[in-house]
Amino acid sequence: EIWRSLVGSEMCIRDRVVDDTEKLVERVQNAQKNKEIVSIAYHGNIVDVWESFYENNITVDIGSDQTSLHNPWSGGYYPVGYSFEEANKLIYENPKKFKSEVILSLKRHVEIVNKHVKRGTYFFDYGNAFLLEASKAEADILKKDGSFKYPSYVQDIMGPMCFDYGFGPFRWVCSSCKQEDLDITDTIACEVLEKLALSAPEDTKQQMMDNIQWIKAAKENELVVGSKARILYADSNGRIEIAKAFNKAIKEGKIGPIILGRDHHDVSGTDSPYRETSNIYDGSQFTADMAIQNVIGDSFRGATWVSIHNGGGVGWGEVINGGFGMLIDGSEKSEINIESMLFWDVNNGIARRNWARNKGAINQISRAMQKNPKLKVTLPNLVDDKLIENI
């Protein structure tokens, strides 16, 4: 149904939505030849795409996988060679056969990805258990030391570029449901970030500029799909200053009350060795203490509500997620809660990443302690591993 509505909609440009690999290859080759900047949707199985691109010598510079393999046997992953309808029928009539087909498909999937990587593709896993389930299927996905051949994107991208510095998905919802309130909050957030960017350290200046560009373009890209809400990557200082500016605007009657929040996929909110904490290499990535501590700490420091849940995005038993919501109403109490809770909510995770000896986190938590003398975090003692190995 989604496919049919896409093809029939005004949003769809027909040559950008295809369901045949030959047409896809032709369209991609033409786009490369004409140096087009274009997104093309393919309706079908991704394994067929990988194989067609390989056979036709189409270079994939960057590849990933976000298949819902945290639910592999009930529709989270559809095996190659089956239509959507055929696979659904197999799930119902012969689940054992469906499982074996998924396993075979995963092996084939990994095999073709490996071939592309040998040609120069940079491949990373999103964290939705592709690597984990591929290893269970005994696909060629492990190095000799037993680790995965490919990183999660938190290991190579999100962790060292964002989470280690406290940057993550800060959110707010306009309780008034008014577009004009959302517009005002966009302007406030942009002004706050532009001011903070003037004194931002060199290792976070680019993140600040990227997020300023994001918030400036948010409205024109029509990102709202329901509640008048916004998401914006910001660090601890950015979140606090933006929230305080919102609170001031509420007090002055410019906007209605705001609900603050964030994604669980953040600096401190989630423990998952396959995604959020995959760039923690001190052995503690398999523990779930950070998410629990965050929820408890947020509850003490002014959150309106907190939540703790299991399985989000990675799979039941593979991740613990924590979240919060904070209503701010322009009061002095709201300002106190903002400074206390948002500071904790971010810096708790930076402390954890600092203990794991992540360079960015060490720098960031050191700056946080300078800014707030009440914050006391033990810094790691960096020593040469050979000192231990030679004992």
Predicted regions and their residues:
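Extended catalytic-interface subdomain
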Residues: 40-58
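Short, flexible, glycine/charge-rich loop motifs used to bind or transfer phosphoryl groups or to couple energy/partner
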Residues: 1-2, 53, 296
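Short acidic-hydrophobic, aromatic-tinged amphipathic segments that line or gate anion-handling sites
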Residues: 14-25, 41-43
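Single conserved hydrophobic/aromatic residue that forms the stacking wall/gate
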Residues: 1-8, 12-13
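Extended charged low-complexity segments that act as oligomerization/scaffolding linkers
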Residues: 21, 28-34
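Short amphipathic alpha-helix with an adjacent loop that forms part of the alpha/beta core around
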Residues: 26-30, 52-55
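Ligand/cofactor-recognition surfaces for anionic moieties
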Residues: 42-46, 62-322, 326-391
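Short, surface-exposed connector motifs at secondary-structure boundaries
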Residues: 32-36, 227-229
